[in-house]
């Protein structure tokens, strides 16, 4: 009789008597389980009397659940032996059971999966519970041993659809290997019949003609593939392929090779060059995705809308003179780009267009600065400038050079424009406060997505005549060269022959960048900036009278646009076209930067006009608010900062050298420019092509590392995909290769009449009929056969100058005429008459004048 279970108490809990099953309890639980199993069998299928002491058959697949679904077999293993029985077994017995149920893979002395006693017994208990639980799924659950293995390895408890419970061998043919099919091969006993010699009918091993050394050598060269039968194999299969296909079971298979489908290649094999993948449609798609508002932009009639619509503007002290406007000189037309990149047409300097440009570029000067002591603070800023940038020893040992030679170079440069030494005026007799004004006909490319809501305004140029500029430019050019020689080593001005953006031994990677964007830079400069540059010019060695004189006629000036009839006074703002524009903007930017930031924290500093860029190992520390409160500038610190200056990215190659790369976004916009004049021999288009090649000479240095840098910097600056920048480089490489590729980007809207003769050339006759129609020119009646020239004087009533044709000229003319006639008669092949209906330039490779049999009408 079973003893009652011990009561719960602290003593029974500590001595281990509470919670431990006695042998009687174990026997009682087993009896109850046997009764439950027998009752289930009696309820769902009539069974003969079964002795509960006997084990239920292992393969009892005929049990049925109440809903008619087949149930799993009630195995003797989980009825007779529970988790408690395995706890009583020794470690060796558990290892045998683990190897029988889980079937681990042996790798040397290791098992995979590794044996864990607790996990193994827990898996047995869970498998026992799952088999007794009611079935809720139509899938076939694994048998007890496989279920224990599935729980232990954390795999599926059910058999797959292609596998049955009694067949768990892997179907090798079901593997998806392209081009190969595998079928199971029957195992062989490994016995090989000995080879029989045909000559002596003896076993080759005993035959005197048997070469044992050759057989030994051949057996030594046997590989894994020689141990398996491979039939119908047309391709080449190596050992690695066989191992991956056979798997860990190493079952002999029959391998059969089939033809693989033709692979789909993103790049056709015949396109072996990177530029072959680039066409005009790809470049246009890049523009559409990168510049979404530019692809549909067309400003062909924007200026017409401005001129014909009502116009309202608020300006002070403006003088309009509409009586002597200069009419627009008609040009010969411009080439039309194939790409639509948002480039605008050339702006005409009409009155409304000039007033709009003056309103934005010259008028409405911002007043953001505080009230300061100009004389004292300007000297302090100039002193900080020399301490931060100038090498005192170099400045003391340097002097002016090449002033006269610079003057002669300037005169030679503009000699073709009519500038001569005799035309140079006396500067003391000239009013230097008067400046000419004009607008730039070319609008700067817009990189922001605002063309759908904002019309770009052209920039303005305020300039002196060349005769005045020629006398100041040589002096400031020599002074700027001296200024470059006196700079510290870490200061770089990317201009001229002395310095550029090429920096050897300097890597821009792993550096902190600082880029300050100064808006409205020219018109925001006031008297404070004029005093600063006056002190700096005196410190650099410019003669004090010239400095004083130069600054005096920049305090108050008057600008006038003769073509538009507009004039207005201006004060201290920068003149955008005089001899000191770039030099003055550069030293003002450097002075402001030195006052707002400590320049000693930077490894490299680059300045060019109103652009600035600094590199440092640590994050830069400074007060950029002084740009606004002290220097009256609208300043913005670019975040995230990238190495970008003068519309160029700075990249470093594998050798640690830095070079500049033009902004791909601006360059791809220039491919759609609308300012190239038309010419019959494409001379203007070729000039633009050479300029394009010169700007993109960096392409030969672009390695994959540099392309990755450019993609990252492009994404950080424009928040656009860096892959587009890499595609732009491929387009640049194609269109810089030769001029014929570049000509695909433009065409002309001039309709050319191409007349091709359809009759024999020997029947062609040209007859000139003397016309009685009279022509009048400068008041003189002339007939078409009159050999007299028009008057050479400036007035229409001048005397006629008779023209005598020399005998040599007439002889040369007759010889040229005979040569043309003989060349024309040599063409005996009749050609059909074709009138071209397409625009000239869209599909041409060479001009019509170079095609045979084409005559322009």
Swiss-Prot record:
What this protein catalyses is: RNA(n) + a ribonucleoside 5'-triphosphate = RNA(n+1) + diphosphate
Every RdRp catalytic domain range: 511-624
The record describes the protein's role as: RNA-dependent RNA polymerase which replicates the viral genome composed of 3 RNA segments, RNA1, RNA2 and RNA3.
- Which residue stretches does the UniProt record annotate as biased composition, category Polar residues? 804-816
What is this enzyme's class at the first EC digit?
transferase
The name on file for this protein is RNA-directed RNA polymerase 2a
A GO BP term, please?
positive stranded viral RNA replication
Q: What is its EC number?
A: 2.7.7.48
According to the record's subunit comment, the protein's assembly and interactions are: Interacts with replication protein 1a.
Q: Which InterPro entries match?
A: Bromoviridae_RdRp, DNA/RNA_pol_sf, RNA-dep_RNA_pol_alsuvir, RNA-dir_pol_PSvirus
User: Can you name the source organism?
Assistant: Cucumber mosaic virus (strain Kor) (CMV)
Which GO terms label this protein's molecular function in UniProt?
nucleotide binding; RNA binding; RNA-directed RNA polymerase activity
The segment annotated Disordered runs over 782-829
Q: Which family does it belong to?
A: Belongs to the ssRNA positive-strand viruses RNA-directed RNA polymerase family.
Arranged from A to Z, the UniProt key words for this protein are: Nucleotide-binding, Nucleotidyltransferase, RNA-directed RNA polymerase, Transferase, Viral RNA replication
Q: Name one Pfam family in it.
A: RdRP_2
Q: Does the keyword Transcription apply?
A: no
Q: Which SUPFAM superfamilies match?
A: DNA/RNA polymerases (SSF56672)
Question: What domain of life does the UniProt record list for this protein's source?
Answer: Viruses
């Amino acid at each position: 009789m079973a003893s009652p279970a011990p009561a719960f108490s602290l003593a029974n809990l500590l001595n281990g008597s509470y919670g431990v099953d006695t042998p009687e309890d174990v026997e009682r639980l087993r009896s109850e389980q046997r009764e439950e199993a027998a009752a289930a069998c009696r309820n769902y299928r009539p069974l003969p009397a079964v002795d509960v002491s006997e084990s239920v058959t292992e393969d009892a697949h005929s049990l049925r659940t109440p809903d008619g679904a087949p149930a799993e077999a009630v195995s003797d293993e989980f009825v007779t032996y529970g988790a408690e029985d395995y706890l009583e077994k020794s470690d060796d017995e558990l290892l045998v059971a683990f190897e029988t149920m889980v079937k681990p893979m042996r790798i040397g002395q290791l098992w995979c999966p590794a044996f864990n006693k607790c996990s193994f017994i827990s898996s047995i208990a869970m498998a026992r519970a799952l088999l007794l639980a009611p079935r809720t799924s139509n899938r076939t659950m694994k048998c007890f041993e496989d279920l224990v293995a599935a729980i232990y390895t954390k795999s599926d408890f059910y058999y797959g659809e292609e596998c049955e419970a009694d067949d768990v061998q892997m179907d090798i043919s079901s593997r998806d290997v392209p081009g190969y099919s595998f079928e199971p091969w029957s195992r062989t006993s490994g016995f090989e019949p000995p080879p029989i010699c045909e000559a002596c009918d003896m076993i080759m091993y005993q035959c005197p003609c048997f070469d044992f050394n050759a057989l030994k050598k051949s057996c030594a060269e046997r590989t894994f593939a020689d141990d398996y039968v491979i039939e119908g194999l047309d391709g080449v299969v190596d050992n690695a392929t066989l191992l991956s296909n056979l798997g860990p079971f190493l079952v002999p298979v029959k391998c059969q090779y089939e033809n693989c489908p033709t692979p789909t290649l993103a790049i056709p094999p015949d396109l072996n060059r990177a530029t072959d993948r680039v066409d005009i449609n790809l470049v246009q798609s890049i523009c559409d995705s990168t510049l979404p508002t530019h692809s549909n932009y067309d400003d062909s009639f924007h200026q017409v809308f401005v001129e014909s619509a009502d116009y309202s503007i608020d300006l002070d002290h403006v003088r309009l003179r509409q009586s002597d406007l200069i009419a627009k000189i008609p040009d010969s037309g411009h080439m039309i780009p194939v790409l639509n990149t948002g480039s605008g047409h050339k702006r005409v300097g009409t009155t409304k267009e000039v007033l709009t440009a003056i309103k934005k570029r010259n008028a409405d000067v911002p007043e953001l600065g505080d009230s300061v002591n100009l004389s004292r603070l300007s000297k302090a800023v100039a002193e900080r400038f020399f301490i931060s940038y100038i090498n005192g020893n170099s400045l003391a040992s340097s002097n002016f050079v090449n002033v006269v030679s610079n003057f002669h170079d300037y005169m030679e440069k503009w000699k073709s424009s009519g500038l001569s030494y005799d035309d140079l005026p006396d500067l003391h007799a000239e009013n230097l406060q008067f400046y000419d004004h004009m607008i730039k006909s070319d609008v700067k490319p817009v990189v922001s997505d605002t063309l759908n809501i904002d019309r770009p305004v052209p920039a303005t140029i305020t300039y002196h005549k060349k005769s005045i500029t020629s006398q100041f430019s040589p002096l400031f050019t020599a002074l700027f060269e001296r200024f470059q020689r006196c700079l510290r080593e870490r200061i770089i001005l990317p201009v001229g022959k002395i310095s550029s953006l090429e920096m050897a031994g300097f890597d821009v990677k792993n550096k902190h960048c600082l880029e300050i964007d100064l808006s409205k830079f020219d018109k925001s400069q006031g008297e404070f900036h004029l005093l600063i540059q006056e002190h700096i010019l005196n410190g650099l060695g410019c003669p004090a009278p010239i400095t004083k004189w130069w600054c005096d006629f920049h305090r108050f000036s008057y600008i006038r646009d003769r073509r538009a009839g507009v004039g207005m006074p201006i004060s201290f703002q920068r003149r955008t076209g005089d001899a000191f524009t770039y030099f003055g903007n550069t030293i003002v930017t450097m002075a402001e930067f030195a006052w707002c930031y400590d320049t000693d924290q930077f490894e490299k500093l680059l300045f060019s006009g109103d652009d600035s860029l600094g590199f440092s190992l640590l994050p830069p520390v400074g007060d950029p608010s002084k740009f606004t409160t002290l220097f009256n500038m609208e300043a913005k610190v670019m975040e995230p900062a990238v190495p970008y200056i003068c519309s160029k990215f700075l990249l470093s190659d594998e050798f640690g050298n830095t070079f500049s790369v033009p902004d791909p976004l601006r360059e791809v916009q220039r491919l759609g420019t609308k300012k190239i004049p038309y010419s019959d021999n494409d001379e203007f288009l070729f000039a633009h092509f050479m300029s394009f090649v010169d700007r993109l000479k960096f392409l030969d240095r672009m390695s994959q590392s540099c392309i990755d840098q450019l993609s990252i910097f492009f994404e950080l600056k424009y928040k656009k995909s860096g892959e587009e920048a890499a595609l732009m480089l491929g387009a640049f490489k194609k269109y810089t290769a030769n001029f014929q590729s570049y000509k695909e980007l433009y065409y002309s809207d001039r309709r050319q009449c191409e007349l091709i003769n359809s009759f024999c050339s020997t029947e062609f006759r040209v007859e000139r009929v003397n016309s009685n129609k009279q022509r009048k020119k400068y008041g003189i009646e002339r007939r078409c056969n009159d050999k007299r020239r028009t008057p050479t004087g400036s007035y229409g009533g001048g005397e006629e100058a008779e023209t005598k044709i020399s005998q040599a000229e007439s002889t040369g003319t007759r010889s040229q005429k005979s040569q043309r006639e003989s060349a024309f008669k040599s063409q005996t092949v009749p050609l059909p008459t074709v009138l071209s209906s397409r625009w000239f330039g869209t599909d041409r490779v060479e001009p019509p004048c170079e095609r045979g049999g084409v005559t322009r009408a």
